[in-house]
């Protein structure tokens, strides 16, 4: 349940202005500022990176974090900062942190924050704001930020005094990780972050009104200032608050053990939620192997079973679900990706496990009905299920029959009318990709093909936006991934359309020494849309792009750009290996691959 509040409304807010002078009066001589309090809490919570696009409202936070050894990574767009924080949250098991300036700096993050909400990523967004006395009075970049972010975040708070910073940040970090993880937002008015002497100077009234009104104004400002800093530097606990994660009951687990033990054709659909902390991904993999049940992996769970597991089924999911006598939805939601539940057979027993009650039962009143619905953590549930079924294994002929039909229906060796066959390009990348690679998916048609062909080598090695289908995640996700796993090879799979959102982050990759490889499928078209728009509506309007020299753009930002066309087909492997070598030597690389049209993804659009 969302928790939105302004600290001034809380019982433990601290002294009111009337009592600010007593006991907790501001220590005027202390040369500290509120940004230091923020930084201290972040360090105590193990935060290693803060992503930002700098602004005067938030400078104290950035400077203080850097002094405490927290790495400040500045991007070329605020959305990238949040996407990078999202990637850090997914890969590190901690909260990702982004700090942006007030007004337009914050509104630029809206799509990225909504994406984190729908992807269930614990992200802390901290935004600057106009001073406490100037909000609503026409100050620079002053808008009602709280109303904007309440629908997007689990928790929103506006700090009203310096002493509230530490408890607010601690609470936000705990809420971000509890229950169903998600983004949280804290607004910092500028006068809660800067030192007393500077704020005091701004509070000074030039030529105050004469008489009683002048005295009242002077008293009010003095009292407000004192209250703003009262108790600011009292010793407070900095360390993490408990995080609550819902779990299945013993009775629920036992009932599921009985159902699975009787099943002849069970299937597991594993979703991103199964990768959430605290259960290590390797433990979940061992549990799945122990169960021996064929699995379809989606979202962040791609790669959970490694590259070539006999249990990982990639194709013909609809047919498998029609034949299955038991389906376990482990963090998987019956939304558009499962045709709102219509692909589930009414004859199957269905076990659904999800931390979020709404997602757990989505569309269950229309197209499907769970036999057992568990509001709990999918990862730990799978561990307990496998422990309860020790000695029992799914009949081997069932996964073997599904695997036999698991052949990609493709024509990778066919020549396209122009340029390279995208399927061939992707096959060569999959063959040459390092075993420690992390794949970032940012695009439509080309990325859709990549999802079939590229095989993540292990858990937490595939990053895509999730249910929101957001374009533009590539630069930020790759930045966060490379910082978390500096020794890993990080690939961004871009469509030429989606590249436009974050190609400027090649500047960030260069400045922050985070070398990645961007593979751009350049067909000069928004092909995901064009595939359906043209046959249905008879027009390609707004779908056309150009065979732009994106490799030159990468060069201009300090990276290494290479164009690959049909004339380069015989040396495709060499060019891919050269890109890998460039990144090992510290240089971000962009492969601008000119691709032709195939019919591989006809009928693939989802609306």
Report the location of each language-model feature.
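Glycine-rich, acidic loop regions that bind phosphate or pyrophosphate groups
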Residues: 5, 127-169, 187-193, 200-208, ...
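Glycine-rich phosphate/diphosphate-binding loops that line cofactor/substrate pockets in enzymes
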Residues: 11-14, 37-47, 87-93, 175-180, ...
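Phosphate/pyrophosphate-binding active-site segments
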Residues: 14-29, 199-204, 208-247, 254, ...
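Active-site diphosphate/adenylate-binding microenvironment
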Residues: 38, 53-56, 61-63, 401-487
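A short, small-residue-rich loop immediately preceding and capping a beta-strand
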Residues: 42, 48-52, 71-73, 91-130, ...
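Active-site nucleophile and cofactor-binding loops and adjacent substrate-binding regions
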Residues: 53-55, 73-83, 98-105, 160-163, ...
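Glycine-rich, anion-gripping cofactor-binding loops and their flanking helix/strand elements
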Residues: 90, 99, 269-359, 456-488, ...
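Thiamine diphosphate
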Residues: 134-143, 281, 321-323, 366-367, ...
């Amino acid at each position: 349940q969302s928790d939105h509040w302004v600290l001034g409304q809380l019982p433990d807010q601290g002294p009111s202005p009337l009592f600010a002078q007593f006991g907790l009066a501001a220590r005027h001589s202390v040369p500290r500022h509120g940004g230091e309090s923020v930084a201290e809490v972040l360090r105590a919570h193990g935060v290693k990176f803060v992503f930002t696009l700098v602004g005067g409202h938030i400078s104290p936070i950035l400077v203080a974090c850097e002094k405490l050894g927290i790495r400040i990574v500045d991007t070329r767009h605020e959305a990238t900062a949040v996407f990078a924080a999202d990637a850090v949250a997914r890969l590190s098991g901690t909260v990702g942190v982004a700090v942006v300036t007030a007004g337009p700096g914050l509104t630029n993050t809206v799509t990225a924050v909504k994406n984190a909400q729908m992807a269930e990523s614990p992200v802390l967004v901290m935004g600057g704001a106009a001073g406490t006395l100037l909000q609503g009075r026409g100050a620079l970049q002053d808008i009602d930020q709280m109303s904007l972010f309440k629908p997007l975040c689990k928790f929103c708070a506006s700090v009203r005094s310096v002493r509230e910073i530490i408890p607010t940040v601690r609470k936000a970090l705990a809420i971000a990780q509890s229950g169903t993880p998600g983004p949280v937002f804290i607004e910092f008015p500028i006068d809660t972050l800067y030192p007393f002497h500077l704020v005091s100077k701004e509070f000074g009234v030039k030529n105050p009104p004469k008489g009683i009104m002048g005295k009242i104004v002077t008293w009010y400002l003095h009292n407000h200032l004192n209250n703003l800093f009262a108790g600011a530097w009292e010793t407070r606990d900095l360390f993490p608050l408990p995080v609550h994660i819902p779990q299945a009951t013993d009775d629920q687990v036992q009932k599921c053990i009985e159902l699975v033990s009787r099943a002849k054709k069970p299937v597991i659909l594993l979703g991103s939620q199964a990768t959430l902390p605290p259960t290590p991904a390797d433990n979940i993999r061992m549990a799945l192997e122990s169960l021996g049940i064929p699995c379809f992996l989606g979202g962040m769970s791609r790669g959970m079973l490694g590259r070539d597991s006999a249990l990982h089924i990639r194709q013909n999911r609809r047919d498998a679900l029609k034949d299955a006598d038991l389906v376990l939805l482990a963090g998987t939601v019956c939304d558009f990706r499962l045709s709102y539940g219509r692909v589930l057979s009414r004859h199957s027993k269905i076990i659904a496990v999800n931390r979020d009650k709404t997602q757990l039962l989505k569309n269950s009143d229309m197209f499907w009905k769970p036999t057992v619905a568990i509001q709990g953590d999918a990862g730990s549930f799978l561990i307990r299920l496998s422990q309860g079924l020790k000695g029992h294994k799914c009949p081997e002929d069932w996964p073997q029959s599904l695997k036999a039909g698991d052949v990609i229906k493709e024509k990778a060796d066919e020549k396209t009318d122009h340029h390279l066959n995208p399927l061939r390009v992707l096959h060569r990348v999959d063959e040459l990709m390092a075993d420690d690679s992390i794949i970032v998916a940012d695009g439509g048609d080309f990325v859709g093909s990549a999802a079939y062909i590229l095989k993540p080598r292990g858990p937490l090695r595939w990053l895509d936006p999730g249910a929101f289908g957001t374009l533009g995640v590539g630069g930020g996700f790759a930045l966060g991934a490379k910082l978390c796993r500096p020794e890993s090879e990080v690939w961004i799979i871009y469509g030429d359309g989606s590249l436009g959102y974050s190609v400027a982050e090649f500047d960030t990759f260069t400045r922050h020494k985070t070398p990645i490889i961007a593979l751009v499928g350049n067909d000069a078209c928004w092909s995901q849309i064009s595939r359906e728009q043209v046959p249905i509506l008879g027009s390609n309007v707004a779908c056309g792009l150009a065979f732009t020299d994106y490799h030159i753009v990468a060069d201009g930002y300090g990276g290494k750009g290479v164009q690959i066309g049909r004339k380069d087909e015989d040396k495709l492997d060499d060019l891919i290996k050269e890109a890998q070598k460039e990144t090992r030597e510290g240089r971000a690389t962009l492969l601008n691959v000119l691709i032709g049209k195939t019919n591989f993804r006809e009928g693939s659009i989802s609306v």
